[in-house]
């Protein structure tokens, strides 16, 4: 129980989520260590059950035959996973998320469809139209995590932007997207975008269509607090996640905002056994400061333990991804579902 002990060590500052026979419940107001007592004036005395949800991320899925991708989506829905996710990269050969998620929506009826969507490098009006129409066609099943893109120089070049501009471009674009999705006619003259008497139709089925954010730098955490609807980091420990959650909520208070306590999730990579040398090297390149086994559980018990620790840290949405593609996707989903879906509420 390494992860849980770390979180509870921080209990006086970060607080606790208590459990009941009905599921995961926010701690009562006045409970010692209540998370929402971190000096932010938020009153969550009307406690509510945390809705635990599990999605599945298909990274590098561009090599999948279309029949297998279709079956993967059908299996996810049949097994009662909450969502399927396609990260966006420019050069890795993965599916284009807008195209593939349109197909996923057509293959399913209830499965939510999501992407880590790169905003910098896109035209705001076109992106607003594309996402609004995908949400409309999927009958309100679209989920979006807005990202600036990978730090790799080739990826940045493929976006057609200057690396140092990406955060500012996203900051300027997000309010434009929200106004367009709300049905406004938009005029805007900014550093990166010029918009004149612009509006879109049809509007998204979801009102509002939410934008979640990731990231770990202080600027990224402040961005979530300032303009985000939710936060979903990756490649960090539950202890680090608890600290980041606190920073997001403190930032939100500075901007007179509240982040819904249900809107904290994590990108969680797992392995079916000891990490391969390639997987270890890849993880160490991204996080050289930490043992990869602290980030990636390598057994069913380890996966359940780290999920438990993330729940204790106040996170309730999980995007699960195998560290390497399985030999059989259907069998992998069956096994994964048997391990985690009993926690879904």
What are the residue ranges of the model-derived segments?
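Short, acidic/polar
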Residues: 64-75, 130, 213-223, 298-309
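Conserved, mostly hydrophobic/aromatic
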Residues: 80, 104, 134, 177, ...
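Flexible, glycine-rich active-site loops centered on histidine and acidic residues
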Residues: 46, 51-65, 120-187, 234-235, ...
């Amino acid at each position: 129980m390494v992860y849980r002990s770390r979180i509870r060590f921080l209990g006086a500052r970060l607080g606790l989520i208590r459990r009941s026979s009905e599921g995961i419940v926010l701690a009562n107001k006045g409970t010692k260590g209540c998370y929402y007592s971190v000096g932010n004036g938020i009153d969550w005395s009307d406690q509510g059950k945390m809705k635990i949800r599990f999605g599945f991320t298909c990274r590098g899925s561009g090599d999948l035959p279309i029949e297998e991708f279709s079956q993967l989506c059908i299996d996810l829905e049949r097994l009662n996973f909450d969502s399927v996710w396609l990260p966006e990269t420019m050069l890795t050969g993965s599916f284009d998320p807008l195209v593939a998620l349109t197909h996923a929506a057509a293959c399913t009826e209830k499965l939510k469809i999501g992407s880590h969507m790169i905003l910098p490098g896109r035209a705001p009006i076109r992106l607003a139209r594309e996402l609004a129409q995908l949400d409309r066609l999927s009958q309100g099943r679209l989920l979006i995590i807005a990202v600036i893109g990978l730090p790799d120089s080739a990826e940045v070049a493929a976006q057609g932007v200057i690396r140092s501009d990406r955060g500012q471009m996203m900051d300027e674009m997000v309010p434009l997207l929200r106004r367009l999705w709300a049905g406004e006619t938009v005029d805007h003259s900014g550093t990166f975008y010029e918009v004149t008497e612009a509006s879109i139709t049809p509007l998204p089925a979801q009102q509002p269509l939410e934008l979640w954010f990731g990231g770990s730098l202080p600027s990224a955490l402040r961005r979530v607090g300032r303009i985000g609807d939710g936060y979903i980091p990756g490649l960090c420990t539950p202890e680090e996640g608890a600290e980041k959650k606190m920073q997001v909520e403190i930032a939100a208070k500075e901007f007179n905002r509240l982040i819904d306590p249900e809107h904290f999730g994590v990108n969680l990579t797992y392995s079916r056994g000891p990490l391969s040398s390639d997987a270890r090297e890849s993880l160490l390149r991204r996080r050289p400061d930490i043992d990869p086994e602290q980030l990636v559980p390598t057994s069913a018990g380890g996966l359940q333990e780290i999920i438990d620790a993330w729940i204790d840290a106040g996170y309730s949405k999980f995007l699960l991804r195998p560290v390497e593609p399985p030999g059989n996707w259907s069998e992998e989903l069956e096994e994964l579902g048997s391990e985690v879906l009993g926690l879904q509420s």
